[in-house]
Amino acid sequence: MEKYEKLEKVGEGTYGKVYKAMEKGTGKLVALKKTRLEMDEEGIPPTALREISLLQMLSTSIYVVRLLCVEHVHQPSTKSQSTKSNLYLVFEYLDTDLKKFIDSYRKGPNPKPLEPFLIQKLMFQLCKGVAHCHSHGVLHRDLKPQNLLLVKDKELLKIADLGLGRAFTVPLKSYTHEIVTLWYRAPEVLLGSTHYSTGVDMWSVGCIFAEMVRRQALFPGDSEFQQLLHIFRLLGTPTEQQWPGVSTLRDWHVYPKWEPQDLTLAVPSLSPQGVDLLTKMLKYNPAERISAKTALDHPYFDSLDKSQF
């Protein structure tokens, strides 16, 4: 790790501390993710190795943050015979994320909506990145604006905090004891379903889409119960007809029977094609949700010059 100079701690990721650092030889900025690893006798656990090779494979897409290399640091532990081991994942450094970007349009001296063309461009890249991950059998499971990094001058979006699903399980609280946000979590996950698939990410993509249009979260719940109420109030309480098996899910209660509202009211500035795409992302039945790959061919993107992607 001598070849990097840590400049500042930029956050506590879901899996450990994140530093902005400079590669001393080149002056290149990188993001260092320090992950805590329980070492076994053989060294790095095979699950972690699998995840890292997955990350390297996914890095081939321009819409996924690039994993540049992995540094393995041993620190002999004074208390016991074992060595404490840290794994540093070295990623390309990006200066902002979608949450900060949306906030810059909402706050500040000159608040204004994001241009429809810009939303379209960012959404296309997000769907491309998610389609890439899904085509390799990887679910993100925690997509949110904070995990989408931006190269502002190029209007380029990249998915971060990816793939560390099984070796580093997503905790309910992060290391700083911030509650991990529920705003982008799919209803089947909130209801305790253990079998979930690519639809969980597409629900999150829909919530992010609406948030770019509204400049505020679509479903800002502060508990799992509240989160479901937010969803049901807008989209109506799901029925067995709409979503077979919903009433058998672990945390299903008898909720008030709300009728669905017109989604247009939540995103008044979105074009009819945009509302149609959003509706397909926010289907209750995960099997009916549009896939990322199919979304790329949706009429909402017809006016976009796709050759630039």
From Swiss-Prot:
Activity regulation remarks: Phosphorylation at Thr-14 or Tyr-15 inactivates the enzyme, while phosphorylation at Thr-176 activates it.
UniProt subcellular location: Nucleus
Sites of Phosphotyrosine modification: 15
Catalytic reaction(s) noted: L-seryl-[protein] + ATP = O-phospho-L-seryl-[protein] + ADP + H(+); L-threonyl-[protein] + ATP = O-phospho-L-threonyl-[protein] + ADP + H(+); [DNA-directed RNA polymerase] + ATP = phospho-[DNA-directed RNA polymerase] + ADP + H(+)
Enzyme kind, highest EC tier: transferase
GO cellular component terms listed in the entry, alphabetical order: cytoplasm; nucleus
Any GO BP annotation: guard mother cell differentiation
Tissue/organ expression: Highly expressed in guard cells and stomatal precursor cells of cotyledons. Expressed in roots, stems, flowers and siliques.
Short name of any one Pfam family annotated for the protein: Pkinase
Role description: May control G2/M (mitosis) phase progression. Plays a role in regulating seedling growth in darkness via regulation of hypocotyl cell elongation and cotyledon cell development. Plays a role in stomatal development. Required to suppress endoreduplication. Together with CDKB1-2, promotes both the last division in the stomatal cell lineage as well as the number of stomata. In collaboration with MYB124 and MYB88, restrict the G1/S transition and chloroplast and nuclear number during stomatal formation, and normally maintain fate and developmental progression throughout the stomatal cell lineage.
Official protein name in the record: Cyclin-dependent kinase B1-1
Species of the source: Arabidopsis thaliana (Mouse-ear cress)
